[in-house]
Every structure is written in structure tokens, then in C-alpha cells.
Amino acid sequence: MESVQELIPLAKEMMTQKSRGKLVKLYVLGSVLAFFGVVLGLVETVCSPFTAASRLRDQEAAVAELRDACEQQSLHKQALIAEGKTQEATLCSRALSLRQHAS
């Protein structure tokens, strides 16, 4: 089919053949589905820059969230290490004071 103008005579010719009524319905169904495919393709082409920008924003937000979580985790680890050192220093000073009293 080179043009849309050939479709109408073809459809009329197919309708005149009574034995092929199912074939006409199938042909019309295929044409409608092809038309919807073309329309959806055009809509996707027009809207794709907007969806790409939103995906990029979502990805940047996810990266920032992960970065914040890693920073919080490292701060928590540093706090635990510092707390462990203070407890260790306290235990060490107690041990030294007990030794002085014992001798």
C-alpha cells in the first residue's frame, strides 16, 4: 500500500466478496492496531525528553540520599570509636590507680 487512498477501494473490493468477511474484519483490526502503534510511537517520541529529565533528577536524588546515608554511617562509626577510646582510657586509669593503692 503506497498511499491511504488505496485503502478505501481495497476495503470496498473486499466487502463485495462475501466469503471473506472475516478477512476484512482481520484487515481492519490490523490497520487500527497499526495506527494506534504509530500514534503511541509519536507520543513516546515527543514525551521522551521530559521522561529522561525526570529519570535524571530521580537518579541524582537517589545518589544524594546514598551519599548522606554513607556520611551518617561514617559519623556514627567515628562516634563509636571515640566512645570506645574514652571507655578504654577510663579503664586504664582505674587499673593504674588500683596498682598504686595495692603497692
UniProtKB/Swiss-Prot annotation:
Keywords: Apoptosis, Cell cycle, Mitochondrion
Pfam families named among the record's database cross-references: G0-G1_switch_2
Main location: mitochondrion
Keyword Protease: no
Domain of life where this protein originates: Eukaryota
GO BP terms in the entry: extrinsic apoptotic signaling pathway; positive regulation of cold-induced thermogenesis; positive regulation of extrinsic apoptotic signaling pathway
This protein's GO CC annotations: mitochondrion
Subcellular localization, as worded in the UniProt entry: Mitochondrion
PANTHER family in alphabetical order: G0/G1 SWITCH PROTEIN 2, G0_G1 SWITCH PROTEIN 2
Function of the molecule: Promotes apoptosis by binding to BCL2, hence preventing the formation of protective BCL2-BAX heterodimers.
UniProt subunit comment: Directly interacts with BCL2; this interaction prevents the formation of the anti-apoptotic BAX-BCL2 complex.
Record-given protein name: G0/G1 switch protein 2
Organism: Rattus norvegicus
